Amino acid sequence: MKLRFTKMQGAGNDFVVLDATREPLTLSPAQYRYLADRRFGVGADQVLIVGASDEPGIDFTYRIVNADGSEVEQCGNGARCFVRYVREAGLTKKSAIRVRTAGGVIEPRWLVDGRVTVDMGAPVFEPARVPFDAAGLQPRELNGFALWPLDAADRTVEAAVVSMGNPHAVMNVAQFGSGGVDEAPVAELGPLVERHTRFPQRVNAGFLQVLSDTHVKLRVYERGAGETLACGTGACAAVVAGIRLGWLRAGTPVDVDTRGGELTIEWAGRSDAPVWMTGPAESVYVGEIDLPEQGD
């Protein structure tokens, strides 16, 4: 099976983009894993599927499949690449579009400097809606916001729990010592938190270092992908949690340094206010792959 694709990246978070606007595309989890495999396939953190929409007021649909073949609700860096793709492919001339994802509707906008800003929607804090099983837990409250205790191996970590259309557990690395995010135990704790039994749909594990009230560093161990160079929804969740906990300033841009580049996040601090994410999106190359016929 011959399959055309576009390789893209946003702050080092890389994607295989597939165009399903003209005809439906049905691949098995094994085929998605093959595409994302960095040794035998193209290589990517996620596969993005661009689809047509017949829903009034919605320009496109957007699906995200992780490197392990699991489908997820949302991907912020992918959303920026999505906008660049549909413009470069001639699918739209609009600078602002509305896109349906499994996590809800997002509204990306193309900026004159080539960056993309995305209305990622309002954050969700209620544990059941994240989803997060908080039964029997006693959180520590800071600035009126909960830090939940999670048992991970031989220690207990504190995490703020937020959904940005997908679940996030945000941990301040100060609890691990003075080494900062570069020395945080991401490889050790990331997979333990990701698959913690309190998160029925697994969770993205964020490791946050606060540099000032408008500047942070972040590493994220993503569901189904492992640690990536950047995570857009993870950056949104980290800033939202930081604002609610009193570490960061509401209503002003917060710079988020990731291993793949800088993202800018802004949130007014109200529970109904959208989170805005701004950052780069680049096309790397266009190619064609002979995809094995394999089921799962």
From Swiss-Prot:
The active site is at residues 75, 231. Pathway: Amino-acid biosynthesis; L-lysine biosynthesis via DAP pathway; DL-2,6-diaminopimelate from LL-2,6-diaminopimelate: step 1/1. The keyword Cytoplasm applies. Substrate binds at residues 13, 46, 66, 76-77, 166, 204, 222-223, 232-233. It is found in: Cytoplasm. Its EC number is 5.1.1.7. GO terms for biological process: lysine biosynthetic process via diaminopimelate. The record marks 168, 222 as: Could be important to modulate the pK values of the two catalytic cysteine residues. Keywords: Amino-acid biosynthesis, Cytoplasm, Isomerase, Lysine biosynthesis. Belongs to the diaminopimelate epimerase family. Homodimer. NCBIfam families: DapF. PANTHER family: DIAMINOPIMELATE EPIMERASE (PTHR31689:SF0), DIAMINOPIMELATE EPIMERASE, CHLOROPLASTIC (PTHR31689). This is Diaminopimelate epimerase. It comes from Methylibium petroleiphilum (strain ATCC BAA-1232 / LMG 22953 / PM1). The gene is dapF.
